[in-house]
Amino acid sequence: MNTRLWLCAATTFGLAAAISGCSSVEQSRAVETARPVSASYAYQGPRSPISVGKFDNRSSFQRGIFSDGIDRLGSQAKTILITHLQQSGRFNVLDRENMTETRQEAGFNRQEQAIKGAAYVVTGDVSEFGRKVVGDRQLFGVLGRDKEQVAYAKVSLNVVKVQTSEVVYSVQGAGEYSLSSREIVGFGSTASYDATLNGKVLDLAIREAVDKLASGIDVGAWKPVP
């Protein structure tokens, strides 16, 4: 009996020592960010000064009865659009979101601002956005199951001429992202909710729309004035 107690105590102590001896491993790496395809092509034409106007979420996503009324998706889309417009190399993008901060810094430097006006304003909407979870089961789930998260986004962009308020060019972009994993006979990982899919699919749809804007300039479908 004493021998059994001693063995149990030794085993428990050994497990505790093994657990306490484990150390966490911290890993990090830089992840390459995607740029518009148009950014990889040299452009020698005129760059029109543009600003980004309203960008609203017109989809049903985050607009239910329990919504707080803050358009986070539209705000995120606007930031992404400004970045990709500048990266495309076809435009001189003017920032209108930080006017107070730039005015303050100019005052600190005792400089007078010379704010440049835009020839065009790009407005946009997230017209479609949604997520769904799909899956299948092998032999009624005995042999495993697959769970896949799918996010879809569609955006619309309109280029408005400041002088006349005329919509001179319009494009749409759409994208889909999915995340899946398979669990086989109780082993493996399942696809838990990944909130980053929202940003990834929105970025993809906007990149496609910006590439269409740039392509329109390259083929002469519309000619922005410098």
Where are these regions (language model features)?
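Active-site donor-binding loop signature of nucleotide-sugar glycosyltransferases
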Residues: 175
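Bacterial N-terminal signal peptides that target proteins for export
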Residues: 1-10
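Soluble periplasmic/extracytoplasmic beta-strand elements of cell-envelope proteins
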Residues: 49-56, 80-84, 92-94, 119-127, ...
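Juxtamembrane/interfacial segments around transmembrane helices
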Residues: 168-172, 207-208
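A structural "domain/chain start" motif
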Residues: 22-93, 98-106, 110, 179, ...
